[in-house]
Amino acid sequence: MTISSAHPETEPKWWKEATFYQIYPASFKDSNDDGWGDMKGIASKLEYIKELGADAIWISPFYDSPQDDMGYDIANYEKVWPTYGTNEDCFALIEKTHKLGMKFITDLVINHCSSEHEWFKESRSSKTNPKRDWFFWRPPKGYDAEGKPIPPNNWKSYFGGSAWTFDEKTQEFYLRLFCSTQPDLNWENEDCRKAIYESAVGYWLDHGVDGFRIDVGSLYSKVVGLPDAPVVDKNSTWQSSDPYTLNGPRIHEFHQEMNQFIRNRVKDGREIMTVGEMQHASDETKRLYTSASRHELSELFNFSHTDVGTSPLFRYNLVPFELKDWKIALAELFRYINGTDCWSTIYLENHDQPRSITRFGDDSPKNRVISGKLLSVLLSALTGTLYVYQGQELGQINFKNWPVEKYEDVEIRNNYNAIKEEHGENSEEMKKFLEAIALISRDHARTPMQWSREEPNAGFSGPSAKPWFYLNDSFREGINVEDEIKDPNSVLNFWKEALKFRKAHKDITVYGYDFEFIDLDNKKLFSFTKKYNNKTLFAALNFSSDATDFKIPNDDSSFKLEFGNYPKKEVDASSRTLKPWEGRIYISE
C-alpha cells in the first residue's frame, strides 16, 4: 500500500485493519453448566472466532460485580467475577488469544463504578472521609410537602427518573447518570483519576491486553456546579444532562492524560489501541478525540446511525425514517476522517443494540438470509475498523412477542417503572414504549449464543442447566452455528467470505477515502463510490424486496464485479437491475 500524503488517515495500523469480534461473556458459552457464560467457555470457542476471520476479540465487562447492569457496575477492577472464572482463567484466555494470532481488548468502565466498590463504600461512610470527593455528593435542594428530599438538580438518568440517589446515612444525594448502584466517579479529583488509571488500566496492561473499549468515554467531564439542565421535554420533571455532561470542558485533557499513562506503562513496544464510546459529537469534536497527533483515542463509536428512527428526547419513542436518513447517518461514522490523521469504526450491532437484520433488513423467513448477507456486504465495503457482535455472523434476529416481564435489562425495567409512575400502565406513553422495546431493546443482543439445535439450550449450556436469560427460539429455525457451518448458503459462511474479500482489498475497503453518495434520494437503493489512489470502489445495494435499477458511474466499463450476496452463477455482472436485497461491489483500477 502507498500512503497518500493528502490522506494521512491511510497510515496502516493493526487496529485499523483488524476485524473485532465482540463477546458478551454472560451469553457466549457456559463451560460448567451453571447457566452463565465464562472464561473457559470463551477459550473453547476461540478457534471458531479465528475461522470466522476475526483478528481481535473485545470482551464486555468480566470484572467482579453485583451485576445490576450486567457487569457495567464494577466492584473490583482487578478481579474477575467468580461466576466467569478466576483471574488465572482470564490470563490463560489472553495467552491463548495471542497464540492464535489475535488481539485481546477489554472493556474500560470508569465513568462510574458499583456502589459495592470499596472506593464508594469509603466515600459514603462519612462527609469527612478522604474519598468523599471521589464522587459527586450534594445536599438536597429542599424538601417537598411530604418531607421527601428534592434532588440537587433536574438531571435525568439514562435509565429513567432522577440522576440522583439519596443516601440516608449522610443525608446527601450522590450523582449516578445510570443506575442507582452506579455512582459517577469525580474526574475533577486528581487522586481519583490516578487510582482509576492504576487499577482499571495499569493492572490489565501489565497482564497483556492490547487495548480498551472505553465505555461512555464522553461523560467524564461534568460542568462545575452541576447546574439545572434546560427544559426540552415538557412532559417530564427530569431533563437530559447532556449540555453539562457530554463532551465536557476537560474531557480532552482527561483522555490525553490517560493516553499518556498507557504509553508510559507499556514497555514491550506493543501498540495499545483505544476505542471510545462517544455517543454524539460534532465532526470537529470527533476529530479532536481521534487525531493521531493529539494522543487521545485511536478511534470512536458514534451513535448517529443506530439512533435513526428514535426520538432525540427519549430513545424508546420511535419516529418514522427513510433509507436516505440512515444513509446520511451511517456516513457520519467515517466521513469526518477524510484527509485527516483521524480514524473511526463501522458497526451495526453490539450489546446495546438490537439485531441489525430486524432493525435495518428484513427478518421474515423469506428475506432474513439474503438481507443479512446484504448488511455484511455493506459493512465489508465501508471505511473504518469493523466490529462484529456475537450472533450477528449467524444472521440472528430479534426475539418476538415477549411480555415485558421476560426482559432482563435494567434500562428497560427502570424506564418501564418511571413511565408507569409518571403516566400510568395503560397510557399512550407506555404503549409507545412497549412498541419500541420490541424493536430496539438491548436485550435482543443478550440472549445466549446459539451453538446448535440441541434442546433446550442450543448448546450454550448443557441440557440440564438453566441459562441466566431466556433463549431466542430462532435456534430451532436453523440460526445456530452447527447448522450454519454445514450449509454453504448460510449467513455464517457468507460472513467468512465477506471478511476474506475485505482483507484481500483492504486498501480500498478499509482505507478508502473521498466517499460520495450516488442517487442519495433513492428510497430503495444505497449506492456510493470511494477511492484509493487509482482505484475506485462502487457499491450498489438494494434495501427493498423489489427489483431495483442502478447505474454504474459514468458508464465506466473498467468496473469489475468483485463481490456480492447472490451466488455468482445467478448474477449477470453486466445487468443494471438488482434482485431483492441484492448487494454488489464493483472495483475499477
From Swiss-Prot:
Record key words, sorted: Glycosidase, Hydrolase, Maltose metabolism, Mitochondrion
Induction summary: Expression is increased in response to the addition of maltose, isomaltose, and alpha-methylglucopyranoside.
Site (Transition state stabilizer): D352
GO terms for MF: alpha-1,4-glucosidase activity; alpha-amylase activity; glucan 1,4-alpha-maltotriohydrolase activity; oligo-1,6-glucosidase activity; sucrose alpha-glucosidase activity
UniProt entry tagged with the keyword Hydrolase: yes
Coiled coil: none
Active-site residue numbers: D215 (nucleophile), E277 (proton donor)
Signal peptide extent: none
Source superkingdom: Eukaryota
Gene Ontology CC terms: mitochondrion
A Pfam entry, by short name: Alpha-amylase
Catalysed transformations (reactions): Hydrolysis of (1->6)-alpha-D-glucosidic linkages in some oligosaccharides produced from starch and glycogen by alpha-amylase, and in isomaltose
Biological process, per Gene Ontology: disaccharide catabolic process; maltose catabolic process; sucrose catabolic process
Cystine crosslinks: none
Subcellular location: Mitochondrion
EC number in record: 3.2.1.10
UniProt function note: Major isomaltase (alpha-1,6-glucosidase) required for isomaltose utilization. Preferentially hydrolyzes isomaltose, palatinose, and methyl-alpha-glucoside, with little activity towards isomaltotriose or longer oligosaccharides. Does not hydrolyze maltose.
Family recorded in the similarity comment: Belongs to the glycosyl hydrolase 13 family.
Note: Present with 752 molecules/cell in log phase SD medium.
Name this protein carries in UniProt: Oligo-1,6-glucosidase IMA1
